[in-house]
Amino acid sequence: MDTQNGRQDRSVALGVVENMIQSHPNLAGIFSVNDGGAMGALAAIQGSGRDIKLTSVDGAPEAVKAIADGTAFIQTTAQFPRDQVRVGLGMALAQYWGARVVPAEVPIDVRTVDSENAADFSW
């Protein structure tokens, strides 16, 4: 196992993953912390011709399309930015208006997007 920093950037992740593929001949899978970096990783995987699975987080349309198209990108966990902003703003306003207790954690739903539901997924 290895950890590298693609800086959540497509072009940086492309180079990082190309190097990882060369350095690790038994590499079978990659997790990216966001779909932007994952798209760079996908380009590196496709360029290598290797069977390496890719997963990520965000649910960005480009990533969802890559999953639906049957690429090495097999899964992303979709976050819902509108809900994150709505809840965060509500908490900030509550505190501004005098609330003294704001929860340390507020769960917000996520959804796994894979080959079974990618064609029908949207935010």
Show where each model-derived region lies.
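A residue-level marker of the well-folded mature domains of exported/periplasmic proteins
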Residues: 1-123
